């Protein structure tokens, strides 16, 4: 501070004030926390009443979404000086105000476990440790409290170090800055069976005790097969809806789809939120995720 106060009298020297954001846990929850960077021209034009043109601002993640709460207010300290730079008096004309704290539902320990497990499994799949090798390079994990909907962990791989964002971003071709947990749209897979089961029960296509005989190869359409048939060349046999969900029986739900029709299935899938955004407090959520 004293150097800056005497900046004009010190030839060849310039003092620059630069805010620093420290990420004490490295890459942990990098896609959730996001990164910061210098305010750009467009951002400054819409915020110049409260920002300087050399400010650092949230660019992604929580730091972007809650920027207005996280940003504090700079203080102003005025001093009187003699011609040789000696301070004769000083007083604060404006106190600095710290930004607010933002408390997340993320459990740091669970987040660490999720990230490590995700990375390990992606590497194992690529190496063929679970059977056939696959060109697997990326993935995502979300852990939620089923009673409240709170997100306890959200991992996306590959991840990144927020402190090194600016030097890495322009050279990145891995997509590691994309939060795949919310920005990727993926087929729902067998989780879709819950929507079909609900529709079948609500619309009277079956009762809780109705049983369907899975023979392995479905007789209609293009004759799709149950996963069990692919592995064991037979079907699950007679199953009710609870058992069909337990064993993830494709044949059972092919039959439910045939009985219900596409419109009813689409209606119930929509009620479950499929094809819609969740409204999570992060930017970049893809519709239908």
Language-model region placement:
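Small/polar-residue-rich segments within soluble enzyme cores
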Residues: 1-99
